[in-house]
């Protein structure tokens, strides 16, 4: 698992759903994720101002999607090796993208361009760019994702 070991210093509750059918943007997946969030928030004492969304690969694409579509549910987004939206017009949420220059499945360029677009718009947007890691070496993204912890703590101040 990537998120648990990388984000352990947050002392957070980590929820890691699987997509139904491979596309996070379907109504079925959106309903399932929002219901899961509602359930977890009802069961645990969670500060709703400190809920981040993160995911790897297709989960990274889902991170971009849920952060864009449900900004009231999340305070930050950390997509890892995920395809960003075509545009980030109107985006306000802090985002830290983790991506490899050597990703042969999800190219680096679109994520880099989206982060630059967000920065130009004044959004708290950062990128952790790594090299020498292919898309399929999930666990090798752990150290890069761990670097998001101080950033996230700063966002949550």
PLM features: residue spans?
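Short amphipathic alpha-helix adjacent to the substrate-entry channel of hydrolases
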Residues: 1-15
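Short beta-to-alpha linker loops that shape the active-site pocket of alpha/beta-hydrolase fold enzymes
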Residues: 18-22, 82-83, 133
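Gly/Ser-rich "nucleophile elbow"/oxyanion-hole loop immediately N-terminal to the catalytic nucleophile
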Residues: 23-58, 68-73
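Short beta-strand immediately N-terminal to the catalytic nucleophile in serine-hydrolase-like folds
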Residues: 53-55, 80, 98
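Hydrolases whose catalytic domains are alpha/beta-hydrolase-1, hotdog thioesterase
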Residues: 62-66
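A conserved short beta-strand
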Residues: 73-83
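Conserved serine/cysteine hydrolase catalytic core
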Residues: 84-92
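C-terminal catalytic histidine-bearing segment of alpha/beta-hydrolase fold enzymes
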Residues: 94, 98, 104, 108-157
């Amino acid at each position: 698992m990537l998120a648990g070991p990388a984000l352990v210093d947050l002392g957070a509750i980590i929820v890691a759903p699987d997509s139904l059918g491979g596309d996070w943007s379907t109504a079925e997946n959106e309903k399932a994720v929002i219901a899961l969030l509602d359930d977890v928030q009802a069961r645990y004492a969670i500060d709703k101002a400190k809920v981040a969304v993160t995911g790897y690969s297709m989960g990274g694409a889902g991170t971009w999607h849920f952060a864009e579509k449900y900004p009231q549910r999340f305070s930050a987004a950390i997509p890892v090796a995920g395809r960003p939206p075509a545009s980030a017009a109107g985006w306000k949420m802090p985002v830290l993208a983790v991506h490899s220059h050597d990703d042969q499945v999800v190219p680096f360029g679109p994520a880099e361009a989206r982060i630059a677009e967000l920065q130009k718009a004044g959004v708290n947007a950062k990128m952790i760019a790594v090299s020498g890691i292919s898309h399929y070496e999930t666990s090798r993204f752990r150290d890069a994702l761990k670097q998001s912890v101080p950033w996230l703590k700063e966002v949550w101040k």
